[in-house]
Structure formats: C-alpha cells, structure tokens
Amino acid sequence: FCYVRDGSLGVASLDGRGERAVITAEGRIGQVFWRPDGEALLYLLTRGDGRSEIRETAVKGGADTLVATTTRYAAFSPNADGSVFAGVTGSAAQPHVVLLLRSTRKELTICEHRASRPGEAAAVFSPDSQRVYFQSDAAGRPAIFSVRLNGVLEQT
C-alpha cells in the first residue's frame, strides 16, 4: 500500500514490512493513486508558488517524472487505464471539473462543481470511463453528481 506521512510518500506491504520512502519532487503531496500496472504511483503535487502537477514515481527506486501541469487542482483521479485524469480546480472564481488527456496534456472543462471545499469534490470515473462522478454542496447539502461524457473518451 502507499501512504503520505510527514509530507513524504512511502510504500509498504500490507503487513507493514518493507516500508520505505519513494522519490518525489519538492512540494506538498496531495492524492496518490497506483498506476494500473502497479509499477508506479501517480500523485498530485502542489508547489510552493501554488502551481499543481500530476507526477509519477516508480516504486522500485526509479525516477520521478512530470506527467502534466494542471490548473491548480484541488483533487484528481485517473481513469481505469491511466490515460485520462479527472480533476477538480480549487479556484472559487472558476470551480471546474476538467478532463486532462495524458498523451496531449490538454484539459477540457466538463462542468462547474461549486463545492465550498473543492478538495472534497473528488471527481472519479465510472469503470468504463463514460461518466465522471463528483460531490458538491452547492445546493446547500452534500450531493453526488454525474456527468455523462457521451463518447468523448474511449471505453476502458
């Protein structure tokens, strides 16, 4: 499993053995996901100047690489094959849910979340990548919303 403790990213087996730190870039580590093949971790990094990035680091002592810079994401998640990311911007002026294509590093806004706490909007894909779900309290109470992507992405 993977974890963030005292600002550092680490991995260990389920019984806690083999615990070790993983190489990361400088900044605050946010959400972390295993890459679908289990060989690397994808994580959200916020730099000291407020910029955010999705980065990838190999679990077995490899290099840390930039996947894409983002529009100040508060949260993100990959689709089933790791080719597209759903992101939630942390801006009150532009509270967007966006898709980020890994291959082109281009973003596409799909809707506004208007959540009072953007990090809790937590956009995630359906297993086939044809819907994005997110949470928002824009109507005064927490609710889960779904956006159908209408074939924008290939099924996974």
Which residue stretches match the model-derived regions?
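Conserved beta-propeller blade repeats
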Residues: F1-V4, A21-L44, T69-V88, A115-V132
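Beta-propeller blade-edge and WD-like acidic-aromatic loop motif
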Residues: V4-V22, E39-L41, T46-L66, V84, ...
